[in-house]
Design a protein with these regions (language model features):
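All-alpha prenyltransferase/terpene-synthase fold signal
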Residues: 1-171
Length: 171
């Protein structure tokens, strides 16, 4: 859902994703917004109705809510938009990307550990969080670099748009 919202004209305004027209280009902005919202609701429904102990479902749902919310992906997306109006420090870029990308990866990793029956206070949860943070950073640095060094054909989406939009990136 987050990528559908990220492609909208009010966010990144991307026309292509993986070489295909973005949802809002194919179906319109209203449908794309609703599709993103519906996918988010479906994620919570899937978590809360999974055949797991109730306390695991609740912990997983809370993990996703925190990862997606104002102190997670949504907060990072807001910083991303603010990064178009001023130049961020490297520390601010790192914070933005940790929220924008890292928090949902963190939620996915932690929910996997929880679904395996590991309690929240187990060191495995902290290990999953560290893993997600490093993977999120690597993904974002690579994505930022490819945005200036790659081609639209290679990426399946426009490149160079971060510079055009004056976005704060690792590059």
């Amino acid at each position: 859902y987050s990528l559908i919202h990220d492609d909208l004209p009010c966010m990144d305004n991307d026309d292509l994703r993986r070489g295909k027209p973005t949802n809002h280009k194919r179906f319109g902005e209203c449908t794309a917004t609703l599709a993103g919202d519906a996918l988010q609701a479906a994620a919570f429904e899937t978590i809360l109705t999974a055949p797991l102990p109730a306390e695991v479902n609740v912990a997983a749902g809370l993990t996703l809510a925190r990862g997606a919310g104002a102190l997670g992906m949504c907060g990072g997306q807001q910083l991303d938009m603010e990064g178009e109006t001023r130049i961020f420090t490297l520390k601010e870029v790192a914070r933005m990307n940790q929220l924008k990308t890292g928090c949902l990866l963190n939620a996915a990793c932690v929910m996997g550990v929880l679904a395996a029956g590991v309690p929240m206070d187990d060191p495995m949860v902290a290990a999953a969080e560290r893993y997600a943070k490093v993977i999120g950073l690597a993904f974002q640095v690579r994505d930022d670099m490819l945005n200036v060094t790659s081609t639209e054909e290679e990426m399946g989406k426009p490149v160079g748009n971060d510079i055009e939009s004056h976005k704060s990136t690792y590059v």
